[in-house]
Structure formats: C-alpha cells, structure tokens
Amino acid sequence: MNRRTRALTVLACALLLPLAGCTTEHTDRPARTPDDTIRAATLTLTDRCLTRQGLTPPRPGQRPANRAEEQRVAAALFGRPPAELSLTLANGIAVRAHTDGCLAAAQRTLYGDQKRWFQVSTVVNNLKPEAAHRDLSLASVRVRHRAELTDWQRLRSRALDASTRVLHTTSH
C-alpha cells in the first residue's frame, strides 16, 4: 500500500468511524461518569455559545486562524477583564473567575448559582492544600468546610441533572 492510499484509508476511517455507532441504541454506549457527563454538557453549551457568536469552538490540536481570532475566542469563552468573582485561599492565593463569557453562561445553566458554585468548588478543590498549609488533617479541614461540601454536593447534583437534559436534547 503506497503512502497516498494509506493516507486515504486513514482519512476514510477517521471520517466513517464516528458514524459506526449511529444506529445503535443509546443503552449500548458505555455509561459516562458524572464528571464526564458534566464536562460533555459544558462543552456542548460553550460550543453553542461560541457558534452563536460566529466563532469556531477550539479543539485540541487545532490552531486558530490567527492571533486576533484566538483572542476573540478566548474573550468570548472565558470573559473579559476584570474578573468579577474572587476568593482568597488559606495560603493567600487569590482565585478569580468571570461572570461573562460562554463558560460562565454554561455554569449558570448547569449549576444554577454560578457565584456559589465558584465559591464552593474553589474551597472543595483546595481542601488538601489548605490542610497542608494549616498543618491540619484533611478530616479536620473537611469538618471546618462542612457547609461548602454540602453545597458542592447539592450544586453538583443539580448540574448532573441539567447536564443529562442538555445531552439528551442534543442527541435527539
């Protein structure tokens, strides 16, 4: 098989392989983890948002047309400065996020309360560093942040339900 034939074969497989499962029932697919479900819905929502603005959603390995396009996509996806949400961690590092942009809109759709999700997810994602910084056990830091952990579970459960709906409406 020469290089050209091999390249065409690979291209054909790449184009047809995604269609191979199109006739199977949804139950034949492996179940997504909750994290994968939320990530997939977030990607779906951010892609829709960018597309509505006439922008091409970024993909791994795909380069933007030019620097200006890359900046437009980044601003639309992540929001424009200044960041409206901020939380200072136990170690003094400030974490910031935007309330505008496609990612923020997706978070509002999935979690309901973007500001509270930002606060609790930042705290929960930094429990181990806080324990190390304060020289405390992780268990004692978890007790200290019981309210944030409870809210994290509630908001994440809401996001999982919303994500399932987003993906269900996308697949039909």
Please identify what each model-predicted range represents.
Residues 2-12, 16-172:
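Mitochondrial intermembrane space
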